[in-house]
Amino acid sequence: MTEQYQHRARKRFGQNFLHDAGVIDRILRSIHAKPEDRMLEIGPGQGALTEGLLGSGAQLDVVELDKDLIPILNQQFAGKSNFNLHQGDALKFDFNTLGAAPGSLRVVGNLPYNISTPLIFHLLQNAGLIRDMHFMLQKEVVERLAAGPGGGDWGRLSIMVQYHCRVEHLFNVGPGAFNPPPKVDSAIVRLVPHAVLPHPAKDHRLLERIVREAFNQRRKTLRNTLKALLSSAEIEAAGVDGSLRPEQLDLAAFVRLADQLADQPKPATD
């Protein structure tokens, strides 16, 4: 980055700018953007990935919250006909305004760690638009995303993301790849929305509710954590052992519990 493009990272935006050329190249090779691709980059920062994505010929929209970076990015990529910059909060961004065809949008980003989980949930609400996602995240978050049942990393984030997507933990990135260096290790993850949900719930909102309630007190048994939603008999009717703890259940079992809740008679209304 030349002097004219220098910008001090801001702690309140969770900014850690990627500068390691080897890591940048490895990320770009993992994404493998093509001229026909429709790309969205969240939090381009100083444009470390942006330059390579534009070089692929893909149409690239970028969303950046930091107003001070907007003129820097506009100047840096002036004249690039495949570059379109949006200043705003990605957590509030309406992805439908991009006009991308269903299942075509490729999303990438070095996500600020303080908003990564809510941003992923926001993107999952638009999973029908998305072909794949490649993110730099805190390594601990990627381990939770990719976790399986039975361990401490398995929880609400794992289950709800895996309900919608296939998760691939690609590789880890050390603090030295960033300026300033974060205090934690990072990792690259690939999320690919399922073309057909492997375990479709009758109502995914009820699945979210079941999972949230179950993991609010993850050391307790299911018959205790879910007693406000399902009786012990209803848990057993879903083919689930109520004496288990939530981390012992796989995604399919949580979907059965949600479907059991969906099948409950609705209270009569006047």
From Swiss-Prot:
This is Ribosomal RNA small subunit methyltransferase A. It catalyses: adenosine(1518)/adenosine(1519) in 16S rRNA + 4 S-adenosyl-L-methionine = N(6)-dimethyladenosine(1518)/N(6)-dimethyladenosine(1519) in 16S rRNA + 4 S-adenosyl-L-homocysteine + 4 H(+). S-adenosyl-L-methionine binds at residues 16, 18, 43, 64, 89, 110. GO terms for cellular component: cytosol. InterPro entries: KsgA/Erm (IPR001737), rRNA_Ade_diMease-like_C (IPR023165), rRNA_Ade_Mease_Trfase_CS (IPR020596), rRNA_Ade_methylase_Trfase_N (IPR020598), rRNA_adenine_dimethylase (IPR011530), SAM-dependent_MTases_sf (IPR029063). One of its GO terms (molecular function) is 16S rRNA (adenine(1518)-N(6)/adenine(1519)-N(6))-dimethyltransferase activity. Its main location: cytoplasm. It comes from Pseudomonas fluorescens (strain ATCC BAA-477 / NRRL B-23932 / Pf-5). Belongs to the class I-like SAM-binding methyltransferase superfamily. rRNA adenine N(6)-methyltransferase family. RsmA subfamily. Transmembrane segments: none annotated. It holds the Pfam family RrnaAD.
